[in-house]
Structures are given as C-alpha cells and as structure tokens.
Amino acid sequence: MTVCKDFTCKRKRIMMNNRKQINIQYYDSPGGRLVLASFADSLCLCDWSDNPFAERNMRRLTRGMNVSFKTGTTSVLKETKRQLDEYFAGKRKAFDIQLRLTGTDFQNEVWNALLDIPYGATKSYKDIARHIGKPKAVRAVAGAIGANGISILIPCHRVIGSDHSLTGYAGGLEAKKMLLGVETIELYYK
C-alpha cells in the first residue's frame, strides 16, 4: 500500500491544475454505508456516512485547496469497491490501494502505525503509542485514531482498550464488532 501525505505526493504535477476535483461515491457495506472519495490517483476518504465527524473529515480534504466535489466513479474508487467486496467476503487480508492522508505529521505517523497491525490481530492505544516511540502520548494517539478518515483500509477498528474492551469507533461499536468478526477476532466485550 502506498501512502502519500496531504496532497503533496511524489508527483508534483498533480498540483498544477487550477481546479482540482474530488470524486465521491457510496459503498454499502455489511456494517453500514461508507463514503469513498478519490483525488487524482489516490483514495482520500473511506468514512462511515453516519459518522458524527464526517463533515470534519471532508473539510480536512479541502483545506487550502480549490476543489470541487463530483459524484462519479474513478478507477481508484472501482478498485476500492472491488477490494472491499473481497475483504467482506473473507478473501482479502490486505489492501493494495494508494492512499492520500490529510492529517498532521503526528496523525499521519499514527495512521501509518495502524497499517502495521496485521489482519486478525488487535493492538491497544498504548501499544500504538509505544510503536511510534511516544509511550506517554496515549491520549494523543487515541485522538489521532479517532480522526482517521480512511476507515477499514487504515485499520483503526483493530485498536482496542488495554483491558481488551471494545472502544469507540466512527462507524459505531456494532460496525467495529462486525469488522473484527470478518477478521475472525474474538474478544470478550465489556
């Protein structure tokens, strides 16, 4: 999986156009409706449509840019849907979609750490804080995870409490349970 930070990937030519376009499409998953968005050749959003922070995530996509939104498909969105279908059918354990992150350096560091959690495994917020070399930043890590706008592909659903309890999730705890179930992760829910 290739990850680019913000909208400044290796290919600066993307930035040349005056008016940029973000393409949006919906995907109905077993856990609820997702909003998918692509910019150029990257996925920049995979968010639950009923997420109370969805609007914030959309604003973050457009910060400092002259963009328009268009409902329509792109090769990135088609491929994302295909890979999500495979994931929910239990046939895909890793995604191969180029992602475009739109967070702070700290958020991007945390989101990249989430990509290291293997399919079928879970980690605690404390584990992630240690993984990025900031063991005392557990609350900040939790905040960054909560701001993840690329659910499922950046597997924030694999993060649980230190006591193995199910903790908050943008798509709701039922969606989180469902995703963990897809990956055959059994927890003792508190």
Which residues does each predicted region cover?
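Basic nucleic-acid-binding alpha-helical/helix-turn surface characteristic of O6-alkylguanine DNA
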Residues: T2-P135, V182, E186-K190
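Major-groove DNA-recognition helix of helix-turn-helix-type DNA-binding domains
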Residues: L153
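Short cysteine clusters
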Residues: C156
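…primarily DNA-binding HTH/wHTH and HhH modules…
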Residues: S162-K190
